[in-house]
A protein has these predicted regions:
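Conserved HGGG/HGGXW glycine-rich cap/lid loop of the alpha/beta-hydrolase fold
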Residues: 9-61
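Active-site loop/oxyanion-hole signature of alpha/beta-hydrolase fold enzymes
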Residues: 41, 50-90
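Conserved alpha/beta-hydrolase "nucleophile elbow" surrounding the catalytic nucleophile
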Residues: 91-96
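Flexible "cap/lid" loop of the alpha/beta hydrolase fold
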Residues: 97-105, 110-142
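Active-site nucleophile elbow and catalytic-triad environment of alpha/beta-hydrolase enzymes
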Residues: 164-180, 186
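Short beta-strand/loop motif that positions the catalytic acidic residue
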Residues: 184, 190-192
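Conserved alpha/beta-hydrolase "acid-adjacent" motif
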Residues: 197-204
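Catalytic active-site module of serine/aspartate enzymes centered on a nucleophile-bearing elbow/loop
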Residues: 215-247
């Protein structure tokens, strides 16, 4: 896996396919850049898809603490290191929060946004769910195995960092997407399924859609939050049409 030095740390990333660059952000505790290589090779090979691991997670060195803005600054610095001036960003869940903040803080770097199954804001219920699901001592064996697969033997350290990062007040404020949606200038496609759930509420997608002036909202019937993994051919076809029509 390639590694570049950004902001004083080494940042791992994958680069898949050929063609115009596209940045993909997922960035959760139960995945990594390597998880998405096969998917991108199969469904997004018309692009050169850049998939980073964020500071403190997956293939990167563990850190005891970081600021939420570090994840955005590191992503911007990665694009600079790869000599990518501006790029469409496809993101899901936590990655959507990083992507929107990147578009607001570094508008020249983001030519378009695609937000799949986004999480728009923090809430106490979500923080409690995350702590129950992923913290050592409460995570079930299936979740531990998933974290071990992508975070390695230091999964517990990564999980504690991930959960505590989400519980910071600075995280909640910085990544409050409805509060900053009006500052997004990039054309934006929001996708999700119509089956609601507490971790990825439909209301989060509609709130961001209402705030971003140049946005499309696509809701797939009889589908859970993640359209990309449930209907990959349809998702990437829609992404291609969106990027073509808004270029």
């Amino acid at each position: 896996m390639p590694n570049v030095q950004v902001n004083g740390i080494g940042l791992n990333y994958e680069a898949v396919g050929s063609g115009p660059p596209l940045l993909f952000l997922a960035c959760t505790i139960d995945d990594s850049a390597t998880k998405w290589v096969d998917h991108m090779e199969r469904y997004a090979s018309d692009y050169r898809v850049i998939i980073p691991d964020v500071r403190g997670l997956a293939g990167n060195a563990r850190v005891a603490d970081a600021e939420p803005s570090d994840w955005v600054a590191d992503t911007a610095a990665l694009l600079d290191a790869l000599d990518i001036a501006s790029v469409p960003v496809v993101a899901e869940t936590l990655g959507s929060r990083i992507a929107v903040r990147l578009a607001v803080d570094h508008p020249g770097k983001v030519s378009a946004l695609v937000l799949n199954g986004l999480i728009a804001r923090s809430n106490p219920e979500g923080d409690a769910w995350r702590r129950q699901m992923f913290m050592p001592g409460t995570a079930n064996p299936e979740n531990i195995e998933q974290m071990r697969l992508f975070q390695g033997d230091t999964w517990a350290e990564a999980a504690e960092f991930y959960v505590k990062m989400h519980e910071k007040e600075s995280f909640r404020t910085y990544f409050d997407l409805p509060a900053i949606a009006g500052d997004v200038r990039a054309p934006t496609l929001i996708t999700r399924g119509d089956i609601d759930d507490a971790a990825h509420p439909i209301e989060h997608s509609t709130a961001v859609h209402a705030g971003v002036a140049a946005s499309w909202l696509s809701v797939h019937p009889n589908t859970s939050f993640n359209v990309m993994t449930n209907h990959p051919e349809e998702f990437w076809s829609l992404v291609g049409r969106f990027l073509s029509e808004t270029a």
